[in-house]
Amino acid sequence: MNKFFSFPILGLLLTCVRFVVAKERLFEWNVTDVYDVDPDGSGNSRWVIGVNNKWPIDPLVVDYGDQVIIKMTNSLANNRTTSLHSHGLFQKFTPYMDGVPQSTQCEIPPGATFYYNYTALQNGTYWVHSHDMSQYPDGLRTPFIINALEEPYDYDEEYIISMTDWYYTPFNILVPDEFKTWKNPTGAEPVPDTGLFNDTANATFAMEPGKTYRLRFINIGAFNNYDVMIEDHNMTIIEVDGEYTEPQEVSSIHLTVAQRYSVLVTAKNSTDRNYAITAYMDESLFDTIPDNYNPNVTAWLSYNSDASYDLGPDIDEIDSYDDAELNPLYSWDVTESNHSINIWFDFFTLGDGANYAEINDSSYVFPKVPSIMIANSTNVDGYNLEPVTYGPYTNAYIFEYGDVVDVIIDNHDTGKHPFHLHGHTFQVLERGEENAGLYSDQESHTYYDNPMRRDTVEIEPGSFIVIRFIADNPGAWVIHCHIEWHMESGLLATFIEAPEMIPSISSPDFVKEQCMLDGVPTIGNGAGNYKNISDLSGAPSPPGEMPAGWTSKAIGTMAACVISACIGMGSIIFYGASIHPVPTEELDENDDLQEAALENAAMFLDTDKAVEKVVEGKDEIK
């Protein structure tokens, strides 16, 4: 289909499709805390966030064209808000359903109910998760499958296989106490305690000889990448991130946080044994590796429940492949880009002593008004066409409808980062190898033919990536690193797409009423000012830069240290120089020890006189 097809006509056609094939699929979610959960059987029980007092949360499964309604009631304890993002869905014509607080909606306050209501206009493997306060690593996430009306590949059965890193301590404790604190100025991310398949240990998937299975792998974790292998089985990739690919046979797949793969696996004819599915954690992401740490997670293809579940031989090296070499099954006929932006990111310690991410020298902070409502309410005199209107730290970029945009992302950091763009899939035009340097450092650039499309892509350390998308989806779409620690650090930007068209798809009244319950304004600029849109005073901002040189506080601290050191040295000198003779009758076989002690005391003294005093003391003792 021509990507520049008329927006109104496309909307009419999609509406017609809904009348032909749509079913209403209502999911009633009461979001609750669930206690005493021990998914790996280690004895490390903790609370999690579940649905209807249950965890793990059942996957959502619908068909293409269905009307999806998630009635989400916030019953969390301790006055916590929440939200729900359908990861990978474009939300065409419903951008206010994307579930990102202060971007497309307001948080769902305690006791309130919000209806996520949209049409499933894609098919493939997705997931839903909270986009609020690091809640999804604490359990508020589950796979979301949209079945195609007609599948391009044949298979007999399918399994959904989620994988996640798991922490025994909840994130609402880890973030303030161990990560985003002056005690962690380098931003070292807490290492997961373990990993899980389908939120449990030793998950099994029954196999029947000769059948072909579609395995939908989804990394719903917070931090870690996984390399996945199936013992003595090859896999054929047919889908990544909701995009069908040309078939590619591989021995392993690499999933960053938020990525998805569908692979076909044909079962063996023999049932004399079972085979391990092993996910290997990418330990290069960890600043430190705990003693006796097990980086591997295991599930099983079960051919015979009476046979043993024995691990095969250890793997010395994983035969990896470059996912950028994958080709989409349905190619895009995309013209050259007419718009290009270059963003870079790195991490810095700011004025509060904690570590923050910055995109082009700016750490993301939520605006006072949700970005999509800023675009809607400042549509006068061209204010909604100016990035600064959305807040000085919203990292906003403006695109016109139909722009073909190249986004060059330079990674100044020493770690890998999975970047995700809401509202789109994108072409991966070029990706530099590890430590290749910046995009501008390269002597030449060669873009892939029929490049892979997906919504989450990994950027190598000290390197770059080039992605291309078409700005055909009016709305406010965040682009961010999907490592949860880095989202907490501010590694986000906002793409404001076709702002002049956003008022025509304005947020419904019930979305705005949700903001009123939250006490959040729905009109104005990023500072919440609507009478004078150019006035950004009071806009939220990150901590200031770490002061250079000696501040008064630092001087005072150093002075206190020097005074304490002088007092300590003075005490040593005073007591060392005031040694009194010991009566001879008290000397015994410990005399040598006493001499050694006196000699050690003399090491702390700087003057010859003091040393002589110690020697005299020794002579008097003798």
Curated annotation (Swiss-Prot):
Is Metal-binding a UniProt keyword of this protein? yes
Please give the Gene Ontology molecular function terms for this protein. Answer: copper ion binding; ferroxidase activity
**Binding annotation for Cu cation 3:** H131, H422, H480
Residues bearing carbohydrate? N30, N79, N117, N123, N198, N202, N234, N269, N296, N338, N360, N376, N532
According to its UniProt record, which cofactors does this protein need? Cu cation
Q: Output the Gene Ontology cellular-component terms.
A: high-affinity iron permease complex
Cofactor binding description: Binds 4 Cu cations per monomer.
**What is this enzyme's class at the first EC digit?**
oxidoreductase
Tell me where the transmembrane regions lie. 554-574
Compartment(s) where it occurs, according to its Swiss-Prot or TrEMBL record: Cell membrane
> Which residue ranges are assigned to the Extracellular compartment in the record's topology?
23-553
Q: Does the keyword Amino-acid biosynthesis apply?
A: no
Q: What is its EC number?
A: 1.-.-.-
Could you say which residues bind Cu cation 4 here? H417, C481, H486
| GO BP | cellular response to iron ion starvation; reductive iron assimilation
Membrane topology category: Single-pass type I membrane protein
Homology family: Belongs to the multicopper oxidase family.
What the protein does comes down to:
Could be an iron transport multicopper oxidase, which is required for Fe(2+) high affinity uptake. May be required to oxidize Fe(2+) and release it from the transporter. Essential component of copper-dependent iron transport.
Q: What is this protein called?
A: Iron transport multicopper oxidase fio1
Q: Which organism is it from?
A: Schizosaccharomyces pombe (strain 972 / ATCC 24843)
